[in-house]
Amino acid sequence: MIARSWRGAVKTADADAYAAYIDETGMQHYASTPGNRGAWMLTREVDGGLTEFITFSLWDSYDAVRAFAGDDYTVARFYPEDDRYLVERDLSCHHWDVVRSTSG
């Protein structure tokens, strides 16, 4: 199993709208991609009036990650309205091989 994460930040005033946007885009895309085992959106307020977003997803294999992200799966995937919200963004994603889990 593969874990994938990405990080970005928006103005806290835009956090609810951006969360709704991620629900409609990235989270739906995760859920509809074969091999996805779940996705989570994490948030926290940070200094400077920003809210940080982390998307975290689990995948059956790197082939499943490629089906979502493309051949260069390390590059973050963005959607048309992301520029409207994001004031910080990681351009790449982190990936880990899951070697132990307490869940099924």
Whereabouts are the PLM-identified features?
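Alpha-helix boundary recognition
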Residues: D23, A31, R66-A69, V87
